[in-house]
From Swiss-Prot:
Biological source species: Prochlorococcus marinus (strain NATL2A)
GO molecular function ontology, one term from the record: aspartate-tRNA ligase activity
Catalytic activity as recorded in UniProt: tRNA(Asx) + L-aspartate + ATP = L-aspartyl-tRNA(Asx) + AMP + diphosphate
Name the record gives this protein: Aspartate--tRNA(Asp/Asn) ligase
Subcellular compartments: Cytoplasm
Binding locations of ATP: R223, D224, E225, Q232, E499, G551, L552, D553, R554
Keyword DNA damage: no
């Protein structure tokens, strides 16, 4: 139907007869000559319709609405000098139309403009409801192509490194760890359910047992969890696993993968090795295991200064096993008012959202005296003030914000406040947001954390991570006692405060795997029922192996400078886990439920 695309025409095509297809981006009538901007996936080209070419042709052009689908035959010619458009790649040429064929018309009112000339902001709910139109827009078109090129770059690198792509099952079994599963009832096996995979974790390990050695997959994953801007119920991982590799080797290989992607997509030469930081250091300095290292305001532990303070909020927090930490905002006295920090203020509210009762603060004055509201200053000695300023490196004009209480809440609070203030004060400029790439490996995660709701230990990553050998020793009889306090050979890759990948060395010893499952509270029968196939495989000569899974949607979001992964997915779900375009999920006929041996107990509250 066409021999050229709209966006590829340049001065070199002058005098060529071309046949184009595309959509009417806009139509303009200038002094008896009609100009049509014709758009396809490659860009736009100006079509000129002259009445000298025939009244029938001109009448067709006069009738065209935006988004009408056309096939146009015409002659490429140079634009007059005064009409050259340097803002678009095809701006030196135009096509003189010889014939216009309408392939389809627009019979409904468009809910929003698709034209590249209209940068109108459209509500996301409208965009998602009419996603097929949204995909015609330049921004979404570019994002999908960037996504394709990212996957293409990853595949090219991995295949050159000897990896093969292997598909793993979508219908698998439900396991108790991690987020809620999406369940699929079995018609054939009444009363039994498949689960959609939260990741290909167990199957990729079994591929290593099977001798594949180097595997990757662009894997679809499903998690029934609460949503936010960078989460979806169904998402895509670049999943990688390899045998006979140590942690250092896996990290180095995946750095090369990231470098290759950034070079091909952004034309940027990233510097390696990426910085590394232990989980403990990240929590101490930033209050989070995915710190944004593009700016300072690091957390400072001041518990030693306040342990015997007369300020009971602080001293009681410390005596109860918690801590007192602070962040320092440079020139905060001029930038942040008391109203914002006190109850009802936006910064105070951020602290409350993280679980804190509030924030305490100190302002450093020009004479290095401190000023505050409440009892903090009254309960600080001159030497304590001096030590505080030394420890925080606070200067005159700076604002110090404090959190006190259980360590996990203090960390979470100051991390949230730190991010909020950095964004609010534009500590990172808009240009830096788009051009600064701060990668960081976070390593040495604890194997477990305590789940107070269930009164048991649970794996921080998953129960298949290998512990550090030096933490558990070689004596199997001591593993159960040593595992709860051990660190995992686990590593996350963080970019600008977002986790883009996570992995670990895996347990390849069946007895150690049994012990880990016992530590998280599974009985022998439960472990056998849920993971017996893995334990059996590990007992049959499983090689040392490890890997990583990258969040493809999140990586593309960052490469595209978008704020939400929904803008990098062709047909995403809303934050209510719905497809507003196809109206899914939806009710089904009772007959379908009967065939599956299930019934719905849902009662519509309306």
């Amino acid at each position: 139907m066409r021999n050229k695309t709209c966006g590829e025409l340049r001065a070199s095509a002058i005098s060529a007869n071309v046949q184009l297809c595309g959509w009417v981006d806009r139509r303009r009538d200038h002094g008896g000559v009609i100009f049509i901007d014709l758009r396809d996936r490659s860009g736009t080209i100006q079509i000129t319709v002259d009445p000298d070419q025939g009244q029938d042709l001109f009448s067709i052009a006069e009738s065209l609405r935006n988004e009408t689908v056309l096939q146009i035959n015409g002659l490429v010619r140079a634009r007059p000098d005064e009409a050259i458009n340097t803002k678009i790649p095809t701006g030196e040429v135009e096509v003189l139309a010889k014939n216009i064929k309408i392939l389809n018309t627009v019979t409904s009112t468009l809910p929003f403009s698709v034209s590249i000339h209209d940068e109108e902001s459209v509500k996301e709910e409208i965009r998602l409801k009419h996603r097929y139109l949204d995909l015609r827009r330049e921004r979404m078109n570019n994002n999908l192509r960037l996504r394709h090129n990212t996957v293409k770059a990853a595949r090219s690198f991995l295949e050159n490194e000897g990896f093969i792509e292997v598909e793993t099952p979508i219908l698998t079994r439900s396991t108790p760890e991690g987020a809620r599963d999406y369940l699929v009832p079995s018609r054939v096996c009444g009363g039994e359910f498949f689960a959609l995979p939260q990741s290909p974790q167990l199957f990729k390990q079994l591929l290593m047992v099977g001798g594949v050695e180097r595997y990757y997959q662009v894997a679809r994953c499903f998690r029934d969890e609460d949503l936010r801007a960078d989460r979806q119920p169904e998402f895509t991982q670049l999943d990688i696993e390899m045998s006979f590799m140590e942690e250092k080797e896996i990290i180095e290989l995946n750095e090369k993968l990231i470098v290759s992607i950034w070079k091909k997509i952004k034309g940027i030469d990233l510097q390696t090795p990426f910085p590394r930081m232990t989980w403990q250091e990240a929590m101490d300095r930033f209050g989070t295991d995915r710190p944004d290292t593009r700016y300072g305001m690091e957390l400072v532990n001041t518990s030693d200064l306040f342990s015997k303070s007369g300020f009971k909020v602080f001293s009681n927090a410390i005596s109860s096993g918690g801590c007192v930490k602070c962040i320092t905002i440079e020139d905060g006295n001029n930038l942040i008012s008391n109203v914002r920090i006190k109850p009802g203020g936006d910064i105070f509210s951020e602290a409350q959202k993280a679980g804190a009762g509030g924030l305490a603060f100190i302002r450093v004055r020009d004479d290095k005296e401190v000023d505050t509201i409440g009892a903090i200053k009254d309960n600080l000695t001159t030497s304590q003030i001096k030590e505080l300023l030394l420890k925080t490196q606070a200067k005159p004009g700076d604002l110090i914000l404090f959190g006190a209480g259980p360590t996990n809440i203090v960390n979470r609070t100051l991390d949230r406040v730190r991010q909020f203030i950095a964004k609010d004060l534009k500590i990172i400029s808009d240009n830096e947001l788009k051009t600064q790439w701060n990668f960081l490996w976070v390593t040495d995660f604890p194997m477990f954390e305590f789940n107070s709701d269930e009164n048991r230990l649970e794996a921080i990553h998953h129960p298949f991570c290998a512990p550090k050998p030096e933490d558990i020793g070689e004596s199997e009889s001591l593993w159960k006692d040593k595992l709860p306090n051990s660190n995992a050979q686990a590593y996350d890759l963080v970019l600008n405060g977002l986790e883009i990948g996570g992995g670990s060395l895996r347990i390849h010893n069946s007895e150690l795997q049994k012990t880990v499952l016992e530590v998280i509270g599974l009985s022998k029968n439960e472990a056998e029922e849920q993971f017996g196939f893995l334990i059996d495989a590990l007992a049959m000569g499983a090689p040392p192996h490890g890997g990583i899974a990258f969040g493809l949607d999140r990586i593309v979001m960052l490469l595209a400078n978008e704020d939400s992964i929904r803008d990098t997915i062709a047909f995403p779900k809303t934050q209510q886990a719905r497809c507003s375009m196809a109206k899914a999920p939806a009710n089904v006929e009772n007959k379908q439920l009967e065939d599956l041996h299930i019934a719905s107990t849902w009662i519509d509250p309306d």
